[in-house]
Regions:
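Amphipathic alpha-helical packing elements
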Residues: 52, 56-114
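Short alpha-helix boundary/capping motifs
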Residues: 104-106, 117, 205, 305
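N-terminal intrinsically disordered, low-complexity tails
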Residues: 1, 5-47
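Membrane-interacting alpha-helical segments
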Residues: 40-60, 124-126
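Short, intrinsically disordered, charge-balanced linker/junction segments flanking boundaries
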Residues: 113-121, 357-358
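N-terminal low-complexity, intrinsically disordered patches enriched in charged
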Residues: 14-15, 91, 293
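Short, conserved sequence motifs enriched in acidic/basic residues, glycine, and aromatics
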Residues: 80, 119, 153-154
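Non-heme di-metal
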Residues: 123-398
């Protein structure tokens, strides 16, 4: 039995013939083979570079910010500073300052309204259940895309830092939807399996999944024009079409309920999620534009046509979802209103990444949604929170 006073002496190891001491150390740390280990595509170039630098210059070369790249970089991804992409770090800090947790939101009024037979119409109840049916698994797909795909291929540590925060926020969002489902006493199997049983939800997920699988493949590596375009396409689909378009029918519907003083606890959580997802979308667009700036050869005429076609398909799928969730007018909304809104959003996302608008002259029929995005966490719009608080970074001992 060891005590704190005893000196711990390492057991000497005999080097194996033909194996370097460093390699033997790595091998000894692995007790058994692990099947299909995901390769961190961003790490390998940095390791190789440092190995070469150590031989030629007598030691590892320190990171120069100017040498950093979004993909295919040769700098050490473990060294966060010096910063090159300060916009990514600033977004990370902003996201941390906006931290929230679902259980902070009081669901008492929502529960009473849901249990009241006359509290909500059947159309309103359908909207809520369809919304939750899509979102409970959508954020899990988004998290999978980040941690099993995108993160491995990004070589800028500032951007990786934001991606880690984003993945955590996706977990919080899934937690929030589960919290709403549990609070209202909904059939969990019905809600959580909706992406297999509700066609309008399944169609959206089937559109997204190939773009996750492409970059999750353990054999996938960037470094060629084709694979770099595959990653760029995946970034565009998730930033502009999933988080930047597929979420907006649901957000609008639930926040419209909140504006009528219905389901205010759920609406407040959706408000925070909307704010988080807006940050994710903006970060993704900045990442896309920086990647394009560093790799202009990827942004070909053919590639742009392919992206435009994906935008058009996404608008079509989200409009079908709007029709399914809202077969009749409710809350002062109807499905046809969303056609203009989705086209307006698609135009905005397209121009943000350097494409021409797909649907000219479309205007925003829901200007109040922009106000929702801009609201700060400290402003309790739906007044369901009993106590406001500051996140850890803003606390003072005074």
């Amino acid at each position: 039995m060891l005590t704190w006073d005893e000196e711990v002496k390492p057991t000497p190891r005999m080097p194996q013939p033909g194996v370097s001491q460093g390699a033997q150390g790595v091998a000894s740390a692995v007790n058994r083979p692990v099947p299909q280990v995901l390769h961190d595509g961003a790490l390998a170039p940095a390791v190789a570079t440092h190995a070469t630098a150590g031989i030629s210059a007598g030691g590892p070369r320190r990171v120069n910010a100017a040498d950093k790249r979004i993909i295919n970089g040769q700098t050490d991804v473990n060294q966060l500073v010096p910063f090159k992409y300060k916009w990514a770090w600033e977004k990370y800090l902003s996201s941390c300052a906006n931290h929230w947790m679902p259980q902070e939101v009081n669901m008492t009024r929502d529960i009473a309204l849901w249990k009241d037979p006359n509290g909500l119409t059947e159309d309103e109840r359908r909207i809520i259940k369809r919304n939750l049916g899509f979102f409970v698994t959508a954020d899990s797909l988004a998290a999978n895309n980040i941690v099993l795909g995108t993160y491995r291929h990004i070589t800028a540590p500032e951007c990786r830092q934001f991606l880690l925060r984003q993945a955590f926020e996706e977990a919080i969002h899934t937690h929030a939807y589960q919290y709403i489902v549990e609070s209202l006493g909904l059939d969990e199997s019905e809600i959580f399996n909706a992406y297999n049983e509700v066609q309008s939800i399944r169609d959206k997920d089937e559109f997204l999944i190939p773009f996750i699988q492409a970059i999750m493949n353990p054999e996938f590596k960037t470094g060629t024009p084709e694979t770099d375009q595959t990653l760029l396409k995946s970034l565009i689909v998730f930033a502009c079409l999933m988080e930047g378009l597929f979420f907006y029918v649901g957000f609008t519907q639930i926040l419209a309920l909140g504006r009528q003083n219905k389901m205010t606890g759920a609406a407040e959580q959706y408000q925070y999620i909307l704010r988080d997802e807006s940050m994710h979308c903006n970060f993704g667009i900045d990442l896309i534009n920086q990647l394009k700036l560093e790799n202009p050869q990827l942004w070909t005429a053919e590639f742009k046509l392919e992206i435009r076609a994906l935008f058009e398909k996404a608008v079509e799928l989200e409009y079908r979802y709007a029709e399914d969730t809202m077969p009749r007018g409710v809350l002062g909304l109807n499905a046809s209103m969303f056609k203009g809104y989705l086209r307006y959003i698609a135009n905005r996302r397209a121009t943000q990444i350097g494409l021409e608008p797909l649907f000219p002259n479309e205007e925003n029929p829901f200007p109040w949604m922009s106000e929702m995005i801009d609201l700060k966490k400290e402003r309790n719009f739906f007044e369901t929170r009993v106590i406001e608080y500051q996140s850890g970074g803003a606390l003072s001992w005074d």
